[in-house]
């Protein structure tokens, strides 16, 4: 079956198969998926942006490796009211869709930043535990 773990901004789904051990590549993919929406909103927060520009940045940062993941996430974020888009004529072909954050999206992103900071701090404490002074 599929279990859904919901952390304030992380929606991870893990396929559980008792006959197959969890492998490192799957674990890496799941960790990246958990921060993908946050990264997409962060990129859009810099100003209106074309989807292929987002894809290039996410791919070069090794956050996204599958192109088919971006468009469903953009649709979900738009349906949630976090972003909007506008069509801009292009001299080199059909009009292009440029994404922008809404006010609700800006507020949501600010909350995610706080969650990200907390999460980084928490994980850092686990990875680098402080030994108590005697």
Regions flagged by a language model, labelled:
Residues 28-69, 88:
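N-terminal helix-turn-helix DNA-binding core of bacterial DNA-binding proteins
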Residues 81:
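Glycine-centered, phosphate/nucleic-acid-interacting loop/turn motifs that mediate DNA/RNA or nucleotide
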Residues 1-27:
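Short, intrinsically disordered or compositionally biased N-terminal tails of bacterial proteins
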Residues 107-134:
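Amphipathic alpha-helical dimerization/coiled-coil segments
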Residues 91, 95-113:
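Basic, amphipathic "hinge/linker" alpha-helix immediately C-terminal to the N-terminal HTH DNA-binding motif
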Residues 75, 90-91:
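Short secondary-structure boundary/capping segments
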Residues 70-72, 76-77:
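Basic amphipathic alpha-helical segments that dock to polyanions
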